[in-house]
């Protein structure tokens, strides 16, 4: 979605664009933007995240394997805030687009301190922690799902959907049949493609496996799974 937004901005204005991400995604981000526009620099921000497991007890969250990384990451968020503040102080952008994720938290707070406008986009049906924390400071909020799924203020929130690049288009019936044959599926049966996030989603994968007999009774299923998922 970010690439789709950058393409539209490139086509409509000549402003300088920069993409910031967590260190873990630096290589993949540079590869993606290298194919699209090498003039957009990819810069890395130090960040930490809060490990929360819904439905688990407080005792579970106090286990050293969870507690210690969370304590460490509090300091990483602080470092990321200082890093973001210094970068923004030098660059002074007109606006910052926040797409969610823990790396956006220190950036958002630094922008708030420097009074740089924030625009949030929430692709998820339920807002993540970072977007919930930054929403009070945002000038505008775009959502991927209808507004009734969110608690964002109506005065600043708008249902805009998911940004999709022009290269992604609906396939014709003939093209869909050809692809089914190419991947070994019956072209006469409906095909359900299931994928969950960049690395797959373990719970989604498990649900598909549990329901496989029911699904396969009526459709073909193509499950795309991340490594170790």
Model-derived regions: residue spans:
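Active-site-proximal region of nucleotide-activated glycan assembly enzymes
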Residues: 39-40, 112-174, 185
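Glycine-rich, highly charged phosphate/nucleotide-binding loops
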Residues: 70-86, 174-178
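Conserved nucleotide-sugar phosphate-binding/catalytic loop shared by glycosyltransferases and other
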Residues: 11-76, 158-160
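Donor-nucleotide binding loops and adjacent catalytic segments primarily
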Residues: 14, 19-20, 25-27, 49, ...
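Short amphipathic alpha-helix
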Residues: 1-10
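Short, solvent-exposed amphipathic helices
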Residues: 76, 100-103
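Short, charged/polar "capping" segments at the starts of alpha-helices
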Residues: 24-31, 148-151, 167-168, 228-229
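Glycosyltransferases and closely related glycan-assembly transferases
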Residues: 32-37, 82-97, 105-119, 132, ...
């Amino acid at each position: 979605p970010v690439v789709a937004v950058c393409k539209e901005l490139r086509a409509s204005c000549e402003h300088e664009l920069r993409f910031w991400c967590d260190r873990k995604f630096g290589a993949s981000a540079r590869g993606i933007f290298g194919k699209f526009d090498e003039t957009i620099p990819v810069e890395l921000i130090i960040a930490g995240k809060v490990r929360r497991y819904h439905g688990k007890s407080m005792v579970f969250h106090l286990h050293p394997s969870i507690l210690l990384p969370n304590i460490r990451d509090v300091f990483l968020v602080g470092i990321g805030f200082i890093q973001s503040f210094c970068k923004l102080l030098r660059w002074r952008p007109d606006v910052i687009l926040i797409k969610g994720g823990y790396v956006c938290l220190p950036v958002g707070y630094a922008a708030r301190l420097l009074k740089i406008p924030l625009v949030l986009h929430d692709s998820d049906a339920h807002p993540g922690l970072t977007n919930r924390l930054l929403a009070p400071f945002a000038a505008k909020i775009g959502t991927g799902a209808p507004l009734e799924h969110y608690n964002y203020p109506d005065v600043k929130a708008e249902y805009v959907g998911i940004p999709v690049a022009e290269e992604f288009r609906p396939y014709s019936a003939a093209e869909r049949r050809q692809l089914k044959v190419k991947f070994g599926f019956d072209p006469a049966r409906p095909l359900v493609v299931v994928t969950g996030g960049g690395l797959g989603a373990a719970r989604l994968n498990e649900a598909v496996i549990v329901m496989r007999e029911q699904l396969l009774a009526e459709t073909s299923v193509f499950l795309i799974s991340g490594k170790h998922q």
